[in-house]
Swiss-Prot record:
Role according to the record: A translational regulator that binds mRNA to regulate translation initiation and/or mRNA stability. Post-transcriptionally represses the expression of genes controlled by GacA/GacS. Binds the 5' UTR of mRNA; the mRNA binds to the outside edge to each monomer and each dimer could bind the same mRNA twice. Recognizes a (A/U)CANGGANG(U/A) consensus, binds to GGA (part of the Shine-Dalgarno sequence) in the 5' UTR loop, which prevents ribosome binding. Overexpression represses target protein expression; mutating nucleotides in the 5' UTR abolishes repression in vivo.
Induction of the gene: Expressed at low levels during exponential growth, considerably more protein expressed in stationary phase (at protein level). Positively controlled by GacA and negatively regulated by CsrA1 and CsrA2.
Organism, scientific name: Pseudomonas protegens (strain DSM 19095 / LMG 27888 / CFBP 6595 / CHA0)
Principal cellular location given in the protein's record: cytoplasm
Annotated consequence of substituting residue 6 to A: Complete loss of repression of hcnA in vivo
Protein's name according to its UniProt entry: Translational regulator CsrA1
Signal peptide: none
InterPro entries associated with the record: CsrA (IPR003751), CsrA_sf (IPR036107)
GO-annotated biological processes: mRNA catabolic process; negative regulation of translational initiation; positive regulation of translational initiation; regulation of carbohydrate metabolic process
Length: 64
């Protein structure tokens, strides 16, 4: 595993087409932006695990 240290506003490039930028840090939470081609799937880990398990996202419609 490659471990890098970045400051807000700095980026990491993966290959020629993917850029990860540190947008902000607040406490233990880090906001990142990911710029990738549309044919590259980008998911949070918990969403990816649900996809792999064949589960769908919870219904976000409100009930009266």
């Amino acid at each position: 595993m490659l471990i890098l240290t970045r400051k807000v506003g700095e980026s990491i490039n993966i290959g020629d087409d993917i850029t990860i930028t540190i947008l902000g840090v607040s406490g233990q939470q880090v906001r990142i932006g990911i710029n990738a081609p549309k044919d590259v799937a980008v998911h949070r880990e918990e969403i990816y695990q649900r996809i792999q398990a064949g589960l769908t996202a919870p219904d976000k419609r409100e009930t009266p």
